[in-house]
Amino acid sequence: MDKRIAIVTGANRGIGTEVVRQLAEKKWKVILTARDEAQGRKACEDLAGRGLDVQFHRLDVTDPENIHRLAQDLKADPGRLDVLVNNAGVLMDEDRGSDRITIETLRRTMEANFFGPFQLSQALLPLLNRSDDARIVNVSSGLGQLSDGGGGYPAYSISKAALNMMTVQLAEDLKGRVKVNSVCPGWVRTEMGGPGATRSVEKGAESIVWLATDPMIPNGKFIRDRKEIAW
């Protein structure tokens, strides 16, 4: 039986690296991508050194040409994808409200957190269509919830709300071919989350890996701790 194949973006550290590790330990072949080539290769080498089937590809999700090259490379080898985990993202908000956030900050945040995942999902869809159980997992945030929204981090929150709507749209348009879900990993102790966060990276990765691997996952939902939450 062929190994299942996943690609995880923004996987040079934190939740991304942990998702790669957990998938690879389930005997998956995992493609680890990162914008920072040195950090990405080191993360890949560390995991491969444990006997895990992990390969590195450099990817800047804000660069359409880079996305196109990656899609062409993956078309040649391995020629198929089962799961895309859109994990790469940025938190660039200054300590100010939406009335004072700069358009440049909003634009750059949207490029990384929304346009990048959208373009990558479109580019890799032909490879996902070759799978008999394809999935896209979009790593979102509770800050993107319209039902529970509050002030703070406006650029990040807006970008994650857009990512959630992308999930809804793709889930409907790809129904029967690719299952698409958003997931909130919670407040995780990463470079983005900070040392005061309440969750380990292992816990943060848990629902992402569940959406990638469990045979009974839903479609078009927002998930936290393996349970559906409101948009």
Residue ranges and their predicted role:
Residues 1-31:
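Canonical Rossmann dinucleotide-binding motif of NAD(H)/NADP(H)-dependent dehydrogenases/reductases
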Residues 9, 81-89, 113, 138, ...:
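Rossmann-fold scaffold of SDR-type NAD(P)-dependent oxidoreductases
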Residues 26-42:
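Conserved glycine-rich Rossmann-like NAD(P)H-binding loop of the short-chain dehydrogenase/reductase
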Residues 37-38, 58-72:
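The beta1-alpha1 cofactor-binding region of Rossmann-like NAD(H)/NADP(H)-dependent oxidoreductases
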Residues 50-53, 73-86, 92-94, 179:
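A glycine-rich helix->loop->beta "capping" turn
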Residues 71, 121, 167, 205-208:
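Short-chain dehydrogenase/reductase
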Residues 90-110, 115-118, 122, 129-176:
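Catalytic loop of short-chain dehydrogenase/reductase
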Residues 175-176, 182-188, 194-231:
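C-terminal helical subdomain
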